[in-house]
Structure formats: C-alpha cells, structure tokens
C-alpha cells in the first residue's frame, strides 16, 4: 500500500462527504513533517478548504479529524499551527510497506499522475565542433536523469539534442577541416586565431585526402563547403554521441538546426506569427547603461516577446538580413509543438540564464498558452583535487573533456556526483575524494550499503539456512521490526515512491541522490549499532524469527537502493 496515495484518496473522499468538493481536495498535499513530534504525515487540506469556503481552518480540520480518525491505519491525529492536520500512522501499516516492496514492487511504485502528458526534454545540445567539454556533463546528467524519472512515473518522454549546425562556429569548423585536408595533401599550414587548433581534426583532413585526393580543391567553393560541412558535422556528432554513450546517455532525436533553413520552416513560422500580430518593424531601445550613440538603432523585424513576460522584444533578423538565432528558436519550438508535444523542457547551462524568459515567450505564443514550458538552468561545476581548484585546460595537461574525466573516475561516479547538489546551485566535484572509500564519498557510501545487504543475505544462507529459507518462502513476521531504528528505516522505504513523485513534479533529480544517501546512512547506523548491541544485528543465531524479519528488511533496502541507482543510471555493485 502506498500510504501517501491512500491517505490522499481518503482525504478526497472526506472532502466530498463534508463539502461536496473533490476538485479542490485534489490540490491538497501529503508531506512528511520535518519534526517527528508533528506526526508521520501532514496535510494542508483544511487551509485549502477554509480559503474556498471562507471559514476557520481549524474548524475545517476538526471536521476532517472526526472522519479520518476512524480509518484503520491511523493511530492519532493532531491539529497544528494555522490548520495543518498531522497524522500518526500505526506501526503495522508501515511494516506492510516491506511486504509490498518485496512482493508487489510494481504496484508499490505506482504513482497517481496525469499520464497523458507528452514531454520533450532538450538537453546538452553542444555545438558539434569537437570533443564534449566536461562543462556539459552536468546538464547532460541532469537532463538524462530527469527523463528517466518522468518515464519511471509514467509520462511519455522524448529526449532531444538540438544540433547547432547552421551558425558561424560551423563555418569555422569547416575552414579548419579544409586546412587539415590541405595539410594531409602535403601543404604546410597555420591555424589562424578563431579556428580550432586541436589535433582531433587532423584525422578528418586525412580521411578527406584519402577519399578525394585533390578533387576538393578543384570544386567551386559552395560545393566544397557543403561536402566538408556535412562530413565534419557528422564526424563531430559521432564523437559527441560516443562521449554521451560513455556516460550512459542516449538521445531519441538529434534535430538539425540546418534542416529548419532547408525546409523554410523559419519563413513559415514568421508568417504565422505575423498573422497573429506578433511580428513588427521597430527600433529597440539601448540596454541600461548603453550610450545611444553606441547602439545600433536601425529598424528591425521584432517578435513581441514582451507580450509574454520577456524584458524586451527580440530581433528575428541579423544586420545582414539573415535569420537570427532567435528566429531558429521560434521555428524549432513550432516543430516540437506540431509533433504533438504538450510540455517542453529546456535544460541550459549557466551561460544561457538570460534565455529563460525569451524561450518561455516563444512557447507561450506558439502554444497559445496550451503548451507547458519549463527552462532549467544547470550551474557551473568546480573541479577540485582535495579542495584545490583544478584548471580545466587541455593545454595545461589537466582534464578538459568528458572523455578525460570519465577515464579518470568512471561514468557512475560522474552521474551520481552531478546530482549531489540542486541543479541551480554551483557544484564542487573533488576528483580525489570521489575515489575514496569513506563516508565522505556519497557514491561509495550508497554502493557500500547495497553490498552490505547482499553480504547479510549471503551470510544468513550459510549460518542460518532455516531463517533464510523461511524468508525466501515469505514466512516472516514483520511485526517484530518494531525498534525505533527499524521503524525509521521502514518509514523512509515507504516514502520512496513519494520521493520519485516529488522529483518528477518539481524536476529535481537531486532528490533521488539525497534520498539514497539518507537511506544508506540510516542502514549503516543500524549496522554499526549492532556491533555494540547484539539485539540490533541483522543475523542473530539465537533468534530465528527476528533474523527472518530482518532479512526481509535488508532485502527491501537492497531493492529500493537498486531502484534508485537504476533511475540515476548507476549500476548497483554486488561486491567491493
């Protein structure tokens, strides 16, 4: 039984009985209070109803108490503060959670959500001009784990990578590859400032030389550019796909910006928005602090993004008359919406924080307020070694690419550590501490808990085969799990689905990592307590029944840790 869902449904039923109102009760929350003295679960239903009915929250709370106290799983109810209803749940109800995890895991993880939503998450979208820089890893992991969470709770999710293959950086890439091609033909070259000096493009020049000889030099410039561009972009995308695959990340769609130009999607989108009265010709005022004489005050085609909360209207053309990057964003959003997407999520780096309002404006306009949009910013990662900052520069011989760091610490450590802080907060990644086998290393701490549960079962099979066989046959008395430490762990296990639901609701994958660290901590504490107090050991040779029950507890811990690591994309370890 999912106790959070069960209590929510019973509150809705009580609301229907008391106030003939189910819809408003759907907005009520069921949370775990921060302080134990406020009970096990708490709801704000009384304050929601009171605001609607214009009556006292405590009066409403008392009416709910009269009905809900009769529920068989409720031990007591207290009214606190302005009208919070705090519930204490009977111990046997928590103990049933162990049985549900072991015997009905799929049903236990069921979450009551609107599963009709079609969600598109765009993340990474690095320019295809070279190996993926480690700076992209946080957004890559955040986006990928968020997609996994949303899929886990039942949404249909598309993971998308927007390929920026139509801008000036691609022109610079082509120019560099052509120089490497000439070099492969025997010319002495110099890579000018502003191009890409990395050695990773040398093999591309060699491949072109082997395939074309000097034929590319004989072609007209436009034909040569097209051939080299298609070749270089595809090779760089292959490189990026491999970097992502090595992190356990696979996108469903790689969408080409160039395709928007090729099929005149930008023109069509501008025509649509013009018909909606959202495109006009005007002069943008200079930004604050900018002198008028230094500002380009030409007449431009502008999108009325201020209609939707943006700080200024946005140009859709550059000074030379070509489409702006913003114009591509307009057409790209329309393409997604035309595919039937009902919720767009953009995951951007810290350097794109200024794009939030303009992207929201685009989707609100094209989606006609029917399509949801969220723009999530991932702050910078500061790499350190024992607390000392590491300069992420290839020229200095330090880590620069995803491949470098992946080779040094492995994908599982990268994925977990990128979730040890909320995405909009800077993160310190200590390249030394993440490899330590200590409590200070969260990924080790969680994996060690998983390994310990396996060790408990293995040892029980050897030392107490009767207890182990009874556990395997589901012959255990869960009421024996009654100590304060055991109940605390069981309550945390029972809140796993709530953690998943909250992570999905607020787009906060770090909650999964935090939950796993908390669960591992409580488990290790009980294990260590058992070293000094034999009654708390998981295997007690003089008490077969309690041992059988604790094998069930250890297995439930193992299953939930494995489930959490699976959501994060980390392989649970069986031994260390």
Curated annotation (Swiss-Prot):
Nucleotide-binding is among the record's keywords = yes
Enzyme class label:
ligase
**InterPro entries xrefs:** aa-tRNA-synth_I_CS, Arg-tRNA-ligase, Arg-tRNA-synth_N, Arg-tRNA-synth_N_sf, ArgRS_core, DALR_anticod-bd, Rossmann-like_a/b/a_fold, tRNAsynth_Ia_anticodon-bd
Q: Which Gene3D superfamilies match?
A: Arginyl tRNA synthetase N-terminal domain (3.30.1360.70), HUPs (3.40.50.620), Isoleucyl-tRNA Synthetase, Domain 1 (1.10.730.10)
Q: List the disulfide bonds.
A: none
Which GO CC terms are listed, alphabetically?
cytoplasm
Keyword Cytoplasm tagged: yes
Q: What is its main location?
A: cytoplasm
Catalytic reaction equation(s)? tRNA(Arg) + L-arginine + ATP = L-arginyl-tRNA(Arg) + AMP + diphosphate
Motif 'HIGH' region: where? 126-136
Q: Which UniProt keywords apply?
A: Aminoacyl-tRNA synthetase, ATP-binding, Cytoplasm, Ligase, Nucleotide-binding, Protein biosynthesis
Q: Which domain of life is it from?
A: Bacteria
Compartments reported by the entry: Cytoplasm
Subunit structure comment from the entry: Monomer.
Q: Which family does it belong to?
A: Belongs to the class-I aminoacyl-tRNA synthetase family.
What protein is this chain from?
Arginine--tRNA ligase
The coding gene here is argS
């Amino acid at each position: 039984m999912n106790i959070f869902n069960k209590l929510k449904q019973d509150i809705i039923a009580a609301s229907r009985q008391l106030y003939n109102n189910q819809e408003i009760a759907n907005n009520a929350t069921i949370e775990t209070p921060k302080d134990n003295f406020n009970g096990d679960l708490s709801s704000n239903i009384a304050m929601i109803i009171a605001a609607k009915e214009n009556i006292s929250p405590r009066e409403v709370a008392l009416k709910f108490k009269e009905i809900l106290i009769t529920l068989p799983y409720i031990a007591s109810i207290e009214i606190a503060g302005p009208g919070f209803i705090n519930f204490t749940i009977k111990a046997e109800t928590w103990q049933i959670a162990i049985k549900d995890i072991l015997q009905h895991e799929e049903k236990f993880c069921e979450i009551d959500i609107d599963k009709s939503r079609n969600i598109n998450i765009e993340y990474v979208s690095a320019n295809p001009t070279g190996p993926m820089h480690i700076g992209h890893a946080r957004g890559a992991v955040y986006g990928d784990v968020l997609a996994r969470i949303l899929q886990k709770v039942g949404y249909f999710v598309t993971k998308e990578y927007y390929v920026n293959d139509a801008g000036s950086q691609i022109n610079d890439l082509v120019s560099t590859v052509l120089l490497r091609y000439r070099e492969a033909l025997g010319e002495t070259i110099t890579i000018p400032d502003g191009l890409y000096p990395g050695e990773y493009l040398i093999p591309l020049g060699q491949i072109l030389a082997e395939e074309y000889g000097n034929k590319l030099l004989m072609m007209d410039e436009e034909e040569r550019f097209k051939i080299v561009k298609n070749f270089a972009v595809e090779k760089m995308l292959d490189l990026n796909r491999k970097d992502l695959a090595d992190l356990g990340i696979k996108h469903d769609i790689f969408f080409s910006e160039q395709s928007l130009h090729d099929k005149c999607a930008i023109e069509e989108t501008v025509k649509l928005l013009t018909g909606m009265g959202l495109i006009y010709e005007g002069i943008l005022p200079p930004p604050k602090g900018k002198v008028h004489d230094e500002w380009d005050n030409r007449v431009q085609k502008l999108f009325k993004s201020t209609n939707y909360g943006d700080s200024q209207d946005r140009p859709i053309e550059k000074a030379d008359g070509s489409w702006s990057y913003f114009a591509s964003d307009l057409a790209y959003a329309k393409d997604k919406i035309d595919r039937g997407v009902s919720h767009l999520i953009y995951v951007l780096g810290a350097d794109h924080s200024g794009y939030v309002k303009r992207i929201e404006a685009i989707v609100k306009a094209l989606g006609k307020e029917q399509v949801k949009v969220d723009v999530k910013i991932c702050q910078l990662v500061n790499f350190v070694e024992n607390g000392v900052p590491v300069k992420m520069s290839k020229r200095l011989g330090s880590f620069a690419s995803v491949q470098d760091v992946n080779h040094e610490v492995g994908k599982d450590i990268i994925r977990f550590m990128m979730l040890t802080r909320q995405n909009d907060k800077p993160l310190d990644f200590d390249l030394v501490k993440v490899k330590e086998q200590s409590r200070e290393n969260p990924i080790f701490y969680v994996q060690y808990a998983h390994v310990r549960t396996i060790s408990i079962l293995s040892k029980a099979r050897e030392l107490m085969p009767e207890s182990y066989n009874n556990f395997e046959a589901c012959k255990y008395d869960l009421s024996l799990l009654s100590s304060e430490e055991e109940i605390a762990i069981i309550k945390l296990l029972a809140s796993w689905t709530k953690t998943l639901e909250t992570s999905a609701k607020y787009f906060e994958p770090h909650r999964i990592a935090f939950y796993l660290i908390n669960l591992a901590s409580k488990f290790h504490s009980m294990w260590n307590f058992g070293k000094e107090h034999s009654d708390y050991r998981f295997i007690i040779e003089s008490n077969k029944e309690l041992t059988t029950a604790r094998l069930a507890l250890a297995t439930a811990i193992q299953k939930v840790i494995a489930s959490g690591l699976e959501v994060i994309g980390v392989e649970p370890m069986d031994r260390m």
